[in-house]
Amino acid sequence: MEQHTPRHRPSGQYAAADTRRAAIIDSALALFAKAGYLNSSLAKIAAEAGTSATVITHHFGSKQRLLMAVLEARDERTMRTFGELGPDSGGDDVRALFREVLALAAYNLTQPGLIQLYTKLSAEAGDPAHPAHAYFAERYERVAHSLASALQRSFDAGQLRPGTDPESIAREILAVSDGLQVQWAIAEGRLDFVGLYRAHLDRLTQALTVDGQGLDEPAGAERLP
């Protein structure tokens, strides 16, 4: 009986496909950030990427799946740089935690398209029918839980004042961060996001810690050059 050797796609074809997918994701990110998801058609994304809507459908299946690929790419970039704050991230120093949060905010400013994407989509996703609604709902819960868990370690270590509610503080930090991101985007980058965020975290550290001291780093240390 004749045996057939399975045909495998050459590695060069895989690389070309990956490159094409990455280019489509970058183009979709730029268009979603500028016009929002609802006002971005596959035809417009294809024109931005220099390809066709058929090619995009071949790689992603639908605009909704492309959106999720864009959001996942955003998270992967952040994870590669900072990892995940959470119960297993180690450490109980609240100042180290806040400095890491501040460094993440500064890193995000190096990718203004991602901030514009996030602020635009998070506003749209308030509608339960929006395809990114579940993503943002899950993400807020996950990030709030991670921050609250890290703050709980600081509380258990005796760094924070009695009566501190880690969950409430985590939600406050997220609210301030998101609010400043919106203002930064509207001001087209002219707002001193990092300086304002650092000032808030410094006041928060003084209010929460038993020793009443602020962040250890000198003012402006985390500012972008």
Identify the meaning behind each predicted range.
Residues 1-19, 212-225:
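N-terminal intrinsically disordered/low-complexity leader segments
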Residues 69, 82-115, 166-173, 220, ...:
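Hydrophobic alpha-helical connector segments
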Residues 2, 20-23, 27-69:
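Helix-turn-helix
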Residues 110-131:
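Amphipathic alpha-helical segments used for helix-helix packing
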Residues 116, 129-141, 156-204, 208-225:
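Hydrophobic/aromatic-rich alpha-helical bundle segments in the mid-to-C-terminal region
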Residues 79, 83-84, 96, 112-113, ...:
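Amphipathic alpha-helical packing segments from all-alpha helical-bundle domains
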Residues 72-79:
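Short, basic, alpha-helical segments at the C-terminal edge of helix-turn-helix-like DNA-binding modules
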